[in-house]
């Protein structure tokens, strides 16, 4: 492997001059020397040592992807199809443009600060942070940041890429109501952030025609599988009376479908099911899952491109980019 000193010897300049050209410090270097060094670098296929690049104080070309949670649905976060596709999209987009992606565990804010500082990351894309955690991090770390699916208490004060969660489940509520499911239930793992917006869309769609939808129709299930299955067993008689369930994620919807199948309950003849995300598994399960489609790939691309613009110094007037969603009708709802 060719060394920096070898390049300097070929160009007839000092090692420091070569280093300055590589790192963009060319104010005191003539154009002729820059051109000569650049030509030799290309001819020799010189690849700079990443450690040197990062310590130079110039762009490391590293993007940090922060996961604010290690576990989702009771499993490792990266096992979830939504998280996996999102992170994979960001990585592909970054590598296509000459950037590197570093995955950072974000449950502890100090870990994010430490990793981002040590590796001189140029910016962060953050999944799983709320407004409070974002401000805690931004006070400790001066880096460009884009959040994904974050919700503020009031107006947005940070860059966010999300979807229209309210509209997605409003469409579900309208659809189920039109199919005659006046007592359908909404099932989620929390009553916060995106789950809260989705529940509100469901509730208001159900109430559009004067059908009161009380909070008792919001079913909160545990975040781990054993607890969820126990909850499904406990609520099975109520589920059968409701005849339709709207879930806040495809994962939970498909898990519930499998549970019902094991109990001998027919989907959709006895219980209709709707999910949210349109994950790759929505078409694998039988019956195929009716769900709300969100473009996860586009979300990852938008987050990456937005961060790169911020790193380049562009100002972003619109703080919250919200992608549209649409209901995909398949086979898990009996019309």
Region locations from a protein language model:
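An alpha-beta-alpha
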Residues: 170-210, 319-332
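Alpha-helical recognition/docking segments in bacterial nutrient-uptake
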Residues: 2, 58, 62-174, 234-241, ...
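Short beta-strand elements in bilobed, periplasmic/extracellular small-molecule ligand-binding domains
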Residues: 91-105, 183-185, 203-227
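Flexible loop/turn connectors
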Residues: 233-335
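Hydrophobic alpha-helical segments within soluble ligand-binding/sensing domains
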Residues: 160-186, 226-233, 253, 294-312
